[in-house]
Each structure stands twice: as C-alpha cells, then as structure tokens.
C-alpha cells in the first residue's frame, strides 16, 4: 500500500475519514503463549514438495488509517473479531495486520502504548484461536513521524532523527511481546522507498538481529526498496537483499504486485489476464536460483473479467511454484472501506460476496494448510 495526504493511504478511492501521507506517484504484556504451527525448514520443504502453499490470507486494513497520531476507534481501528471470523469461515488461514509504528511507540526508545499493544495482542490471540496466522505489518514505508515537529514530517529510518538503532529498539520490543506467539510472523516494514537498497539492507539486518536477540524465532518477512515490487526487484537492485543475515535462518522476502499499467495499485483495471504472473516471474526465478523463499504480501484485482482472470492466474502460478512461495495475502479486507472501494474484499451492502473474494476463498479452502 502506498501513501498519500497525511498518512499511509489505501489504494484507489480513499474513504473520506482517512487522511494519508505522500502518494507513490506524488513523491512518485509480555510474552504471549499461543498455540500455533511452527515454521521450521523441514515443514516448509515438505509443503513445497507436496505442491501446497502454507498460507492463503487477506490484509485487514484499518490500523494504518487516519490522522497522526489519531484516536483509536475514530481515526483508525484494529481488526474486530467479526472481521477475523468472516475470513476464517471462508477458509483463509492468515491475516496481515497493518499498523503504525508511531501509535505503538509515540516516543522513540520507550515502552509501547498499552492500549494499542493490547489491541494487537487481542487480534493475535483471537486469530490463533480461529486457526489463523498473523503477519504483524509495520506500515511505515521506512519512515516515521515525530511529536517534536507536530507529526507533520516524515523522517527516513537511518536519518539523524530516526536512527537505525531506534528502529531496532522498536523491533526488539515487538519481538519481546510476541516471541511466544508461534502464529505470528514479523513483517519488518511495509514498502520501503526513498533509499538505496544497500542502506535498507543494513537497516533490515539490524531489525532481524533485534528480533533474534529478544528470543523471537518466528518467520521474518523482509521487503526490498522501491515499494518492494516483485516486477522491479532486480531493476531496483534489491538483489543485494540476498545478503540478509538471520541467525535463525527463518526469513522470506515479501513482495507486492498489482496488475494496473504502472503496478501502483491505483487502478482496478488489469492490463492483461496473466499480467501478475508475468510481473513476478523475474523475482520468482531469482529466488529459486538462490534458494530463497517468498511471500506475496499485497495484490489485488478489480471486478471486470480481465482483472478476475488475472487474479485467478496469479493464484494458480503461486501454487504451481510453491517451492518458492510460502503463500499470499490479498489486498484488502477491513470494514472501514467504503462499499465502492476498488479493492475491497468485504461483502457488499447487500451482503453479497465479492467476486474477488470468491476466487481467493476457493484457493484458500483447497490449498492452504492450518496451524498444527
């Protein structure tokens, strides 16, 4: 997901209540004990050999919405139990939960806000009880805002005001809370942009080191720069991310891929029925050649025939290449989307299932595994 206005923006037409920063095109308690499936190398290899993806999920947007810092329930919200129930009942086994670093930790280097930490904890616990894994998605684009300048300026991670050590501290605190939750995966950062891949590599390695120092052994999902586009992985020089250092050796590369003309996800119109599969191919080949695993953290389609065909096609491609892909999370669920949002997966006002959701649910029911 890209950014616009004053905070991370939803793709396409934006709900009025959501004010977001910088479009892609304008600047272009304590450890949880949760029963869940582990993500060991042996199990990943077994599923790859069987031609089965581990994860089929959806993004549940809302925690990244609104003015900064915002008020929970007014400017932003975390997934409710009913949101999780809807997708669990359709057969999905994963949710990706976007939220803002600033809301968990308004002041760098300090303990998390109990209310926001508590809400995320409830989401993880409830989802695990429903058999769903949770990707914790720090939805900040490799930058954050500070109270000192009235929450108006975006400061890159690695800058003087937001040093890499501050991000590592944040990641370590997140790990300390959720290291006992085996259903959790740590999405290091949503769609980094505005920096060189070499600089992002240093930051990502510091984040992973912080996770592992705190004892978190779950999967880390590592994005690249240039919004972590699969289509631009090589051209953006994200191949340098092959130098990731993970003492636990439990990481995968997270990429995003949209089907519109410029891969921005700002139009619902797919440019071809196989465009998604075509665009991920070069990244997929790089992963296979280098022995890496991957996760498609965002993709979406409109409701026209070509776009729906492209959605079905990419799901089939991911499944056919399960030696590379761990799984996927489609964009986007979340009950704060307006009924006419171009990529909503929520039921229509008439309670009718969206055609996109129907396609995704078919793959989720037939292909995805559940936590042990």
Model-flagged regions — what are they?
Residues 51-236:
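Active-site mouth of glycoside hydrolases
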Residues 76, 169, 176, 180-185, ...:
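Extracellular glycoside hydrolase catalytic/binding regions
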Residues 316-317, 321-372:
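Extended, alpha-helix-rich binding/interface surfaces that flank or overlap catalytic cores
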Residues 36-40:
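Hydrophobic h-region of N-terminal signal peptides that target proteins for export
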Residues 6-35:
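N-terminal secretory signal peptides and thylakoid transit peptides that target proteins
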Residues 20-21, 41-54:
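C-terminal segment of N-terminal export signals and the immediately downstream linker at the start
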């Amino acid at each position: 997901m890209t950014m616009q206005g004053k905070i991370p923006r939803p793709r396409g037409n934006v709900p009025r209540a959501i004010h977001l920063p910088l479009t892609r095109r304008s600047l272009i308690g304590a450890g949880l004990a949760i029963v869940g499936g582990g993500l060991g190398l042996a199990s990943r290899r077994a599923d790859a050999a069987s031609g089965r993806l581990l994860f089929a999920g959806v993004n549940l947007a809302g925690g990244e919405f609104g003015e900064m810092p915002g008020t929970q329930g007014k400017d932003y919200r975390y997934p409710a139990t009913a949101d999780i129930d809807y997708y669990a009942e359709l057969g999905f086994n994963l949710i990706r939960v976007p939220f803002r670093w600033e809301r968990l930790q308004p002041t760098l280097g300090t303990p998390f806000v109990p209310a926001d930490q508590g809400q995320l904890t409830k989401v993880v616990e409830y989802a695990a009880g429903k058999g769903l894994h949770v990707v914790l998605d720090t939805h900040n684009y490799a930058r954050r805002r500070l109270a000192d300048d009235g929450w108006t300026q975006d400061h890159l991670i690695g800058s003087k005001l937001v040093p890499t050590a501050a991000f590592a501290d944040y990641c370590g605190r997140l790990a300390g809370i959720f290291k006992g939750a085996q259903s959790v995966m740590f999405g290091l950062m949503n769609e980094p942009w505005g920096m060189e891949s070499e600089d992002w590599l240093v930051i990502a390695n510091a984040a992973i080191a912080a996770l592992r120092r705190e004892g978190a052994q779950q999967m880390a999902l590592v994005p690249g720069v240039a919004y972590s586009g699969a289509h631009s992985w090589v051209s953006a020089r994200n191949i340098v991310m092959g130098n990731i250092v993970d003492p636990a050796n439990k990481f995968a590369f997270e990429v995003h891929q949209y089907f519109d003309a410029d891969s921005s996800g700002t139009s619902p119109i797919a440019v071809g029925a196989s465009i998604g599969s075509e665009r991920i191919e070069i990244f997929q080949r790089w992963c296979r050649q280098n022995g890496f695993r991957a996760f498609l953290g965002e993709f979406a389609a409109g409701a026209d025939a070509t776009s729906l065909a492209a959605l079905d096609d990419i799901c089939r491609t991911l499944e056919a290449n399960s030696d590379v892909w761990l799984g996927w999370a489609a964009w986007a669920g979340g009950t704060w989307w307006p009924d006419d949002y171009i990529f909503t997966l929520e039921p229509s006002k008439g309670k009718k299932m969206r055609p996109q959701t129907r396609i995704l649910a078919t793959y989720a029911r037939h292909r995805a595994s559940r936590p042990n």
